[in-house]
Amino acid sequence: MSQPVPLFDTYKNFQFLTRHNLDGELPAVLEAFERFSNPTEAMDGYSVVKLFLKSYAANQATFNSYRTHVERLLLWSLLVCRKPILHLRRQDAEAFLEFCLNPPENWVGPVTKSRFVRIGGRRKADSDTFVINPDWRPFNYTVSKATRKLADETDSAMPGIQAYQMSQTTIAQVFTVCGSFYQFCIDEDYTDANPFRAVKQKSRYKQSVVSQVTSRSLTQLQWEFVIEAAEHMAEQEPEFHERTLFILTTLFSMYLRVSDLTGRDNWQPTMGSFKKAGDNWWFHVVGKGNKAAKVSVRDSYLPYLIRYRTTLGLTDLPYPGEQTPLLSSLDGRTGLSGRRIRELIQMVFDAACARMIEEGLQEDCDALRAASLHWLRHTSATLDAPFRDMKDLQADLRHESLSTTQDSYYDSLDDQRASSIKAIPIKGR
């Protein structure tokens, strides 16, 4: 395949797609995968991009913008660079940005009304099929009504792709969105590198205006709904969801990433990963970059640990050197995949959202729909920051730089800074 094709449908139809399988995709999209040189790489890249877009599915305008830019990146990686999207490096990111500034003719066309065309009768029916709109292009130019009318009257061709020019604002959006995509992939443990962060001459692609990063954390109220939903699920179906409650509280209480629960090639978490030193409990992990670390365990987490261990028929608390797997499948197999853990957390989010709707909290539900597992880490750190020393929080988050912790979780210091000057008069002091 050399001609780019649309891979993602409208915002409305995207809402019906599931996160972790391709059951809801249009047949036209599935057929398009088979025409790529490596269909498996195409589907893998598509699946990760879909998860990224799901995290922005609460807002249609944001979704449409992010879909445009990250879909271009996916198509470029497959058709031009011929690399999996998660294997791109700095040079590739720079090449893509230059590509966006000057796309080839077959990637540019006029704005089309639809990405997919319905085939069927005059009225919509379940039997209708959808095919890819052959006029769709990743990059679009607009032609004014006057220009179109003049072309019709003089029987001349309308301006073509030479009319396309990407604005500085748009290329800045490309840079930001693609960088956000790779940060999402890092957070979700799909990759360790963000090629757009490493781009040289960033000023060429970034606006000088500093944009505010959207927070990816739940409010205190939303978190209360989430944990109460998990507790209710555990009470109703303990054989299935005591483990779910344990996973949720473990991720939240210790700011963990999903890989801290699934393990790595050279390390697997066990109950023995909990170790007591004096009066304090610690959870020992091997994190990103194979770095060993320990995370402090709060007292309020221990009842959840005891509760889960009781369902497994274990002693209340772990003993030194215990090799019991931290997590197992319901049929007793050691460990859980990251995909399965995400599915369980999503079940909790869905249950919490349903309860929010019952109580008239539609906006909170809309926000929760955008949440992913990694939001638990951000949520916990955000809620804990006012009560913890910055360096202690940095250590438990395992941030290399203190400034990362400060910039992410101590924005309230700006409020203190602003309020400290509000009441100071210019005269008459």
Positions of PLM-derived features:
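Catalytic-site neighborhood detector that most strongly recognizes the C-terminal catalytic loop/helix
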Residues: 397-422
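C-terminal secondary-structure termini that scaffold catalytic or DNA-interacting sites
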Residues: 423-429
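Basic, Lys/Arg- and aromatic-enriched nucleic-acid-binding interface segment
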Residues: 165-168, 225-258
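Short pre-functional
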Residues: 179-183, 242-262, 283, 383
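Conserved tyrosine-mediated DNA breakage-rejoining catalytic core shared by Y-recombinases
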Residues: 263-307, 313
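C-terminal catalytic core of Y-nucleophile DNA break-rejoin enzymes
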Residues: 287-307, 322-348
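N-terminal core-binding DNA-recognition domain of tyrosine recombinases/integrases
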Residues: 47-64, 71-213, 233-234
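Short, basic (Lys/Arg/His-rich) helix/loop patches that form interaction surfaces
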Residues: 342-395, 402-403
